[in-house]
Amino acid sequence: VDLLVDDPDTKSILLFLEAVRDGDKLAAAARRAYDAGKPVLAYKLGRSEAGRELALSHSGAIAGPAKAADAFFQANAIARLEMLEGLLEASPLFIGHPPPKGKRVAVVTTTGGGAASVADRLGMLGATLVPAPESVRTALREHGLEIGRGPLVDLTMAGTREGVYGAALENLLAADEIDAVVTVVGSSGQFKPELAVAPIVEKAAGSSKPVAAFIAPQADKSLALLQEAGIANFRTPEACADALMAFLNRRAPRPVLHHVEPLHEVDDALRDVAHRAHRALRAAANGLQLDIRLH
């Protein structure tokens, strides 16, 4: 990681981790990366007992309890992804964007079904879905469009008219009550890729807030255009939501108050506590049996 922090061509750092062998070293490198403006994203095995056993058998290291890993990543500004696909697609969300103030997301779309699949997953993961602010509604009225007040900014097919999608996205990105925006494009992404993604490319460029694009059904040409423009684009709603939540959960590194224990040492400590508790319970049970016999 240290080498990548110093590499001028590296913009973000992706980690596939079976275990963390040296917590101090990784923490220091991740903090250097944060100071250099290079986000560190991680996918780590070990959420389940089976995953921890696989990591142990393959690497010979202790994978560590999931909560300890989460706390370690959070303290050192390492964004943890739950899906490998999300890890590979998420970098543009983080590059050039500081940690957000909250977890407030607007979902703007021309296809209700595709947007609902992302919004549902975001809600399950803890995001707050923000309806269209009045500034967005006013801008859309100028284009002859009145939208509902639900959790989706649903432009319907009217969003394919010139200027409509761009007006909505521009005002959503400018709204103080929104931390990130998901753009969902429907079938126009397949048949008119340049027109479908043009307003996203135009309005997302230079924004201080990230934009996550999901196109349903999949449209490879549109995805390629977004990729070329440096905009995060996703092939599934699950990966889109996973990546965006990793961004929303990220915070600046916490102050170092004491020695950061490697995860395998944390795991050893927890195991020792469990053994001592087990011995205490056995001793208490034996004492109870003796007391019963005496009476």
Regions found by a protein language model. Name each.
Residues 1-263, 267, 271-278, 285-287, ...:
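Catalytic-core regions of core metabolic enzymes
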